[in-house]
Structures are given as C-alpha cells and as structure tokens.
C-alpha cells in the first residue's frame, strides 16, 4: 500500500470529543509506523435558529439557538497494512462522524 494516502475527516458538535478522537487516530497511526499530517482544524460551521417563545402572541420574544459543527482533517502518508488494520479496530465515540478516503 505504499505511495498512497488516507485522508480522514472528523466532524462533531463537541470540540473536546473531536480532539480526543483525533489524538487517538494520530497515536494509533504513529505506533504502526505511518507518517501523520495534522490534525488540521477546519473552520467551525455555525447554524443559528430563531424560535418564537410563545405559541400565540408576543412575536418580539424569541429564543436564539445555535449549533456549532467542528471539523478536523488529517492525512496518513504511506500507510502500512498494520496501520489500516489498527484504524479499522479503533473504537471512537458515537458523537464523532468519520469520513475516510483513499487517495
């Protein structure tokens, strides 16, 4: 599997969770002898919502809510078979979305 690259993109609402997951991936890849670039923090996506507080009147009274989506990007250069096996066995928390691409 030499001269390949694995690109891993992590997405989560909690930045502590995503940083711990990224650290686990980096440690696992380095332990198996691969070169890791990253994690690179990508811009945080912020979605804002305005919701009426009252079901009937008082249109001027509203709640403002937001959801922040944190992103991290990392590349694993020249992965070995051990690296791929270790990453497949890695157990990450449920709040982290992982996208893996082979390039």
UniProtKB/Swiss-Prot annotation:
Signal peptide: none annotated. GO terms for molecular function: structural constituent of ribosome; tRNA binding. It comes from the Bacteria. It holds the Pfam family Ribosomal_S10. Keywords: Ribonucleoprotein, Ribosomal protein. GO terms for cellular component: ribonucleoprotein complex; ribosome. SMART domains: Ribosomal_S10. SUPFAM superfamilies: Ribosomal protein S10. One of its GO terms (biological process) is translation. Part of the 30S ribosomal subunit. Belongs to the universal ribosomal protein uS10 family. Involved in the binding of tRNA to the ribosomes. This is Small ribosomal subunit protein uS10.
């Amino acid at each position: 599997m030499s001269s390949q690259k694995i690109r891993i993109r992590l997405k989560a609402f909690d930045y502590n969770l995503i940083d711990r997951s990224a650290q686990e991936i980096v440690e696992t890849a380095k332990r198996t002898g691969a070169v890791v670039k990253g994690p690179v923090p990508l811009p945080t996506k912020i979605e804002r919502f305005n919701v009426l507080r009252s079901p009937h009147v008082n249109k001027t009274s509203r709640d403002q809510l937001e959801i922040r989506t944190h992103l991290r990007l990392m590349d694993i250069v020249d992965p070995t078979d051990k690296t791929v096996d270790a990453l497949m066995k890695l157990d990450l928390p449920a709040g982290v979305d992982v996208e893996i691409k082979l390039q």
